[in-house]
């Protein structure tokens, strides 16, 4: 396998796993362990097979970094644990060389999705005010979830964030090929 092929292998595999997670998230609003654990193991084994122990450990670190970034949002009540586990698996598969791009494109995709959902539901102004409220709340209360503006409240706008993760992977893959 050439370097070019192996470099595409990682984001392509991460994209495939993120798409599978997205299907579950859209249908059930959950990303089950039956998706995330095998994806995580695929990432470790893929890096071990193509790059050896050092690359596998680097992939493990990439998964941990992604997980820590998303853990902040989980602890603040902004996303579910399945999303955290999925981004950990995706980070492990993609590895350090794609880590920043996947996180950045995922954030952009998630922001676009959130604004789009707020527009479609006619709640853009309310959503923007809620974002201000969340910033204020977390500035004073740390990561403690807001009493009303969290994913446990059925009245809040919620979106299947695995779609944003898949979007981030697709965009990373696209720009890797382009």
Give the residues covered by each predicted segment.
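A membrane-topology feature that recognizes alpha-helical transmembrane segments
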Residues: 1-178
